[in-house]
Amino acid sequence: MQISDLRIALFSGNYNYTRDGANQALNRLVGSLLAKGAKVRVYSPKVANPDFEATGDLVGLPNVPMPVKGRGEYRLPTGIGAAVKRDLEAFQPNIVHVSSPDPSGHAALRWAQDHNIPVLASVHTRFETYPRYYNMAFLEPLIIRLLRRFYTRCDALVAPSQSMIDELLAMGMHADIGLWSRGVDRTIFSS
């Protein structure tokens, strides 16, 4: 298969509405794939005034404000409704990339499996550690189990560093985890 044969449906909990490292990496990935001839369609929550313009086609996902005190800038995608499923059917992806194990990521995984489409998951953050910051560390074992259930159902898993891969392997998140290093933007960091 040539890169120009790829039809990628990318699901992201935050593609461009709030700037962070994960969505910067995803936007660069989409830009690179598009430049090489791949077809990419991004599915993520949309807001009226995003922090930056999205790279590629962006389809809005149903969402609600993040139900965590102090994180009102983030949205929680609630799944993929009928309109998104129709859009997926029309786009006809041959790979689904899920960048967040949120409700839309779970729904995208189920949809892809129902359509015999391979699923790549990328890990961008240590979600299992989040409860520590809200005095709910007791939830960490449950979150690890939920993440493991999600990631082991994916066909491939990638992480940004060897240390992250080692952590994910130790938690049994997937048997084979690839390295997706982001590199350094030489237009910003140069000698």
Where are these regions (language model features)?
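Helix C-cap/helix->beta junction micro-motif
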Residues: K36, F91, W111-H115
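Donor nucleotide-sugar binding/catalytic pocket of nucleotide-sugar-dependent glycosyltransferases
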Residues: S44, G60, I144-S191
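Nucleotide-sugar donor phosphate/pyrophosphate-binding loop at the beta->alpha transition
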Residues: P118-L120, T129-R149, A159, R186
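A short, charged, and often flexible helix/loop element on the N-terminal side
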Residues: G56-R86
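An aromatic- and histidine-rich active-site surface loop
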Residues: V96-V123, E128
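Alpha-helix capping/helix-boundary segments
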Residues: A48, P103-S104, S163-I165
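Structural alpha-helical scaffold elements that stabilize or flank donor/cofactor-binding regions
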Residues: D87-E89, R149-F150
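N-terminal subdomain of nucleotide-sugar transferases
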Residues: M1-P62
